[in-house]
Amino acid sequence: MLNVTITDSAQTYLRELLEKQACEGIGIRMFVSNPGTPQAETCIAYCRPGEAEEADHVMELSGFNAYFEDRSVPFLDEAKVDYAPDKMGGQLTIRAPNSKMPKISDDSPIEDKINYVLYNEVNPGLASHGGNVSLERLTDDGMAILRFGGGCQGCSAVDMTLKQGVEKTLMERIPELAGVRDVTDHSDKSNAYY
């Protein structure tokens, strides 16, 4: 169930923006990039006719439709879009208190499961060395492409950390994962822990 509030002032502002696009049937699409992670960002984009996904949730508003990415809906729970006019024109604000909160179930996309394990189990251990690891992308064959940062970049123990720590943890927690691969440039040793 969709639990997002778009205030009247935000609807008026968005409707005016959409009218300037001169595109019949244009709406907005709301989604969260990197949901459930500290890097989560809540986004609003134009959604031209035909650009909405079949699984999107739709909110019919006065003069336009708002589409919500299905994968993002749990992270948009209790979100509020508001517009506050001021002397400089105004500001559109999006508050999504659950966008950074991990919400994982058996049905969650594999990317969300990987991010959950990385940010809640792996990175707290790497943080003691000033390091971190993040998911760059997931290949079509189920391989997690990872990037190390901070003290892990250039660290001489990164192979051991990858195989015995990160990969082992991810493979135990996410059996559908085919494996992991590191794409970090470890020749830069300026922040390396070892």
UniProtKB/Swiss-Prot annotation:
Keyword Glycoprotein appears in the UniProt entry: no
Q: Which Pfam families match?
A: Fe-S_biosyn, NifU
Q: What note does UniProt attach to the cofactor annotation?
A: Binds 1 [4Fe-4S] cluster per subunit. The cluster is presumably bound at the interface of two monomers.
Which SUPFAM superfamilies is this protein grouped with? Fe-S cluster assembly (FSCA) domain-like, HesB-like domain
Q: What cofactor does this protein call for?
A: [4Fe-4S] cluster
- Similarity comment: family membership: Belongs to the NfuA family.
Protein's job = Involved in iron-sulfur cluster biogenesis. Binds a 4Fe-4S cluster, can transfer this cluster to apoproteins, and thereby intervenes in the maturation of Fe/S proteins. Could also act as a scaffold/chaperone for damaged Fe/S proteins.
Q: What name appears for this protein in its UniProt entry?
A: Fe/S biogenesis protein NfuA
* Species this chain originates from: Teredinibacter turnerae (strain ATCC 39867 / T7901)
Q: Which lineage?
A: Bacteria, Pseudomonadati, Pseudomonadota, Gammaproteobacteria, Cellvibrionales
Q: Which gene encodes it?
A: nfuA
